Amino acid sequence: MTAILGPKPNQIPLGAMLPQQTAAGPIKTTTITSGSGTFTPVVTGGLCVVKLIGGGGGGGRGTTGIQAAGGGAAGVAVEFTARPTAALSYAIGAAGVGSTTNNTAGTAGGLTRLGNWVAPGGTGGTATGAAAAAITVGAGWVTGGAGGTGGTGATGQTGSAPGGLPAATGTAAGGSASTGGGGGGGGDSTDGSGGAGGNGDATTGTAGSNATGYGGGGGGGGAGGTTTGNGGNGSAGYILILEYGNV
């Protein structure tokens, strides 16, 4: 197997790794976005280019006061080639759920699996406002962006982009502050955007937004003196399989 990297499923650099005969494109494209089951290749032993993304973590919800919750981290992406000679079982990583209880972290996203290959889900956003750390991965994998930190009477931090560095360069902004701090933005995956952090308020914080696409992290809830905002939900993972047959 050969590990490759690519930012989007329709931008995999096939010319750099596949024979010239594949220039006409795949003979079949399979996209799986939910559930579990079995994948059977069109051609036994045929070349498959595969991308897996784990589910994104849900955003946290803080305790009453000025400290907002952190955003959820995004799911990991892994790309590889394989020549399966039999059917492979698969399961899509579920979206992490944003917290709806005071002083509680969001849940982690589920791992996505195809055969023996797995893409881990992102960690849930914290109730304390600390960043939901990105998962450390090896070569051929792309780390999902970390969740942004919740603000302590201040604006929440933007979530991180896939790959993780530099921090706070993702698309999901932290929430604004008004006495209570803003929630941290969710991390971005290669194929999903994190949810924005909820806004803080002197009395009632707002909820973090849900992630979009595949594998994004949910936004952290905003802080409030009497009521804190819920965390936003992450988004589920997915599987992309491009089949090229006997090449």
Question: Can you say where each PLM-predicted feature lies in the sequence?
Answer:
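Enriched but not universal
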Residues: 1-49, 81, 238-247
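Intrinsic-disorder/low-complexity loop/linker signature
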Residues: 9, 24, 64, 116, ...
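Ser/Thr- (and often Asn-) enriched beta-sheet segments in non-cytosolic proteins
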Residues: 13, 29-40, 87-91, 116-118, ...
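Glycine-rich strand-loop-strand elements at beta-sheet edges
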Residues: 31-38, 52-116, 195-201, 206, ...
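Short loop/turn segments at secondary-structure transitions that flank enzyme active sites
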Residues: 56, 120-125, 220, 245-247
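Collagen triple-helix signature
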Residues: 71, 106-109, 124, 144-162, ...
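Acidic, low-complexity glycine/serine/threonine-rich segments
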Residues: 93-158
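Bulky hydrophobic/aromatic "packing anchor" residues in well-ordered structure
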Residues: 119, 214-215
